[in-house]
């Protein structure tokens, strides 16, 4: 999973982030507390001194709330350690506390400021028209500052459901693939996914939450467990190799992984998606105003602290999960060598997919007449053109330290995965890396039609993005 620049800039800086957060949330309530102490309540209007004392107390409560946010993050990260059950139960609650705690904090600070400013006009300036105008101008300036702060926090309350482009299969028409998945589920004692989705990407993943799928005509929401399968990789994987990859993904439906995937992973990914969106917004603001949007950055510091503290845990847990799931994959394919060959293909041919995808985007963007009708078959043709059959082992040796990006995590380097299963590089041959038979594509009836329809959908999406 690609992390945002905001997160990367403060990686492994727990103490710095903690101190910065304490200062950010503490400074305004402290200022308000002491400023309120200077007002007597006598002026154009008589203000009850008890009301002023009440606002002083509120500023202390807001100070306590603000400081509690970074402290709770720090204590939560110490308490949960690497315990997946604790993380799964505490992280969602902590995230909501940070989001709504900050919104309440900002709302209270705005109210206290308005009250302080009213007292200032009332006591010192007697509510004369000229001073009211000055006060209004200053208030407008203050409200110019706060919307970006509120926006920075409010961004994290949104839930953006981006649908997956793909086709949801049914058991009646696609009994072969359902039968394979069912047999593998029983073999490794994992939960059988209710849904199987095919998509034109190089992703394989298993997910235990609702998933929106768009097939070009309708958008449907799939409930319960879903297995997503890459159509392009069906073209290059043998049936046994595909069984290994599916076995790996089904391994994530086993035991604690399911609870962790349902409660922690979606919220963690959502936070990261918001950070990535903020990265783009900050870049746009820099180009437009020639400066950093510091006010929004100040508002999201608590989220950076929250995200970074748990991202370190996620990295370690994710690696442990992947290596554990690899053993399920090896069992499913009946051989560690076969499973590692399948993984090796994913690492190597992913490079070809990037080239194919870029070519496809360029054709759409430049409105070239020779359109790609089947992106999956174009991927296979490109692979045969670009990859020299007798040099695939060389590519593989160069890729063995590469961490493969995945929609929900980062897979460990291939070298670690080979060591985990006791497979040496010598076991992988050039011949096995270019062998696509018996093809796993044979498990899907009318696969060409599915590929062509999804290629049309991706073509239209790309055209829309270029025009907008």
Question: What are the residue ranges of the model-derived segments?
Answer:
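Cytosolic-facing loops and C-terminal tails of multi-pass membrane proteins
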Residues: 1-67, 287-318, 323, 327, ...
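Hydrophobic or amphipathic, alpha-helical segments that drive membrane association/targeting
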Residues: 1-206, 350, 427-435, 444-468
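Hydrophobic topogenic segments
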Residues: 76-92, 269-272, 276-283, 307-324, ...
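Peri-catalytic and regulatory segments of divalent metal-dependent proteins
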Residues: 152-262, 266
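Short, charged/polar micro-motifs that form catalytic or ligand-binding hotspots
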Residues: 136, 140, 167-171, 232, ...
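Membrane-interface, cytosolic juxtamembrane amphipathic helix immediately N-terminal to a transmembrane helix
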Residues: 2-19, 80-99, 232-264, 322, ...
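Short, flexible helix-coil linker/hinge segments at the edges of structured domains or between repeats
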Residues: 209-222, 267-308, 366-370
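Post-HEXXH active-site segment of zinc metalloproteases
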Residues: 255-289, 339-347, 428
